[in-house]
UniProtKB/Swiss-Prot annotation:
Its EC number is 3.5.1.49. The active site is at residues 60, 133, 166. It comes from Helicobacter pylori (strain J99 / ATCC 700824). This is Formamidase. GO terms for biological process: putrescine biosynthetic process from arginine. Keywords: Hydrolase. Signal peptide: none annotated. PANTHER family: FORMAMIDASE, NITRILASE C965.09-RELATED. One of its GO terms (molecular function) is N-carbamoylputrescine amidase activity. The keyword Metal-binding does not apply.
């Protein structure tokens, strides 16, 4: 079940390409326009070099960068849909590929902070999935918590796609939500620096294994004069093994063959370690059909809006003041 990548379309399944886009240095709207041109050029070049590719993925922050002094300013924000997403849609249609792109999205409510958003565009140039990051990387990220849940859409080669953004991938419940809604290929786009490199690799594998689904993950690469972004695009099999692992090179293209039917077959035919099923059917050998209530306190408390850790009252950091953000909520950083 290994993969060394490919230039051609497999007979079944599909070929994916994850682009380790160089971390953008963005100081003006002109720089954003340049990034968009670069992303579109790279999309077309990737299709030309890998003619069988059907899904091309770009990392978080590849469009607008990570200039923390300006990333909340109106100059740096985009709309979804908007002029810029139309350019991406045109490129996907011309190249006849699915594309995954990152957008820092202006909040329709002008009184609140922007969203960190991912979109999937199909080969007809239509936005078929829009996801807003549910778990911003607090306390450093100022994005408003996403309000669209975890959508799933049809993709190439029998795939059902979902996208999470960077820190979302550290939340196992979110990967489980995607799988519970039918996802068999879980995409993660990130702008992480090296502090969490090992944890990135670990969670990409565990998200695959716990849910019997492929994971395809890609991070920015390079140095932005403060942090180094590690690249290391990773494709994991549904059994949690790594099929392809990128390096730390900016512009590296990590490719691999994905066979969604194999993940689907595992979900249907496995007994041992079919854990996404076992969660809701505990002890089904002794009790026909199993016990449907897992008895998990935190799930019940989350559902009731009462989630609270035993040590929560004693925690030192529960707002963004360490990074200079106000603690009153509402729109800031315009």
């Amino acid at each position: 079940m290994g993969s060394i990548g490919s230039m051609g379309k497999p007979i079944e399944g599909f070929l994916v390409a994850a682009i380790q886009f160089p971390v953008p240095i963005v100081n003006s709207r002109k720089d954003i326009d340049h990034n968009i041109e670069s992303i579109i050029r790279t999309l077309h070049a990737t299709k030309a070099g890998y003619p069988g590719v059907e899904l091309i993925i770009f990392p978080e922050y590849s469009t607008q960068g990570l200039n923390t002094a300006k990333w909340l300013s109106e100059e740096f924000l985009l709309d979804v849909p908007g002029k810029e997403t139309e350019l991406y849609a045109k490129a996907c249609k011309e190249a006849k590929v699915y594309g995954v792109l990152s957008i820092m999205e202006r909040n329709p409510d002008s009184n609140e902070n922007p969203y960190n958003t991912a979109i999937i565009i199909d080969p007809q140039g239509k936005i078929i999935l829009k996801y807003r990051k549910l778990f911003p990387w607090n306390p450093i990220e100022p994005w408003y918590p996403g309000d669209l849940g975890m959508p799933v859409c049809e993709g190439p080669g029998g795939s059902k796609l979902a996208v999470c953004i960077c820190h979302d991938g550290m939340i196992p419940e979110l990967a489980r939500e995607a799988a519970y809604k039918g996802c068999n290929v879980y995409i993660r786009i990130s702008g992480y620096s090296t502090q969490v490199n090992d944890q990135w690799i670990l969670t990409n594998r565990s998200n695959a294994w716990h849910n019997l689904m492929y994971t395809v993950s890609v991070n920015l690469a390079g140095y932005d004069n403060v942090f180094y972004y590690f690249g290391e695009g990773q494709i994991c099999n549904f059994d949690g093994t790594t099929l392809v692992q990128g390096h730390r090179n900016p512009w590296e293209i990590v490719t691999g063959e994905i066979y969604p039917k194999m993940a689907d077959n595992a979900r249907l035919s496995w007994g041992l370690e079919n854990n996404i099923y076992n969660l809701g059917h505990r002890g089904y050998v002794a009790k026909p059909g199993g016990e449907h209530d897992a008895g998990l306190t935190y799930i019940k408390d989350l559902a009731a809006g009462k989630y609270k850790l035993p040590w929560e009252d004693h925690m030192k950091i529960k707002d963004g003041s360490i990074y200079g953000y106000p603690t009153t909520g509402g729109r800031f950083g315009k």
